[in-house]
């Protein structure tokens, strides 16, 4: 069985800890000019992503679920690389890892929270197959995809994100949201590109990110240069939606 309610409960705790250490780090730096609490903040920042691996996974029992959470605790990307010889920074990291282990030990099956939206990290063989399929279809790898340079995707439409913002809700409706799920494929601090299965399309955040449907029949790509590109079967409806912005196309 899956423990999605517990996973949501755990996720909310990780978010709370991340924000707590973010605030404390700023305050300590303001007070003393120095703080290593960023180590704790980045630990929980990474955990908020990694717990998404647990969504919809089946476990034999709750003990197996807890064991899977513990396996996520070691940092994949060390935020203390600049301080490898700084024992204080490493001590902060070990202390934070233990804080997380202790919390997982205290988790119970009754620790449950409702999910505000669906978000699952795609990993393993499923991720490998999906990465290959997206590369074959759209020549996209969660890295800068320049829409003017020759590529096999055919016709595209691109414009600056600012001209799309007034149409955001209607664009989401064109994608089938909220009644369907999309793949969100973008750059990440924690992986060589992260793929999430989501039922919400987040507003532009300034990073490389693409949204695709389950059949990969279209792509919406946001670049770090404030542009958005559309290609595939969604192109016709998007042209109708953005007809008033034609002077800003391409």
Question: Can you annotate each of these PLM segments?
Answer:
Residues 1-250:
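Structured alpha/beta or helical-core interaction and ligand-binding surfaces enriched in interleaved
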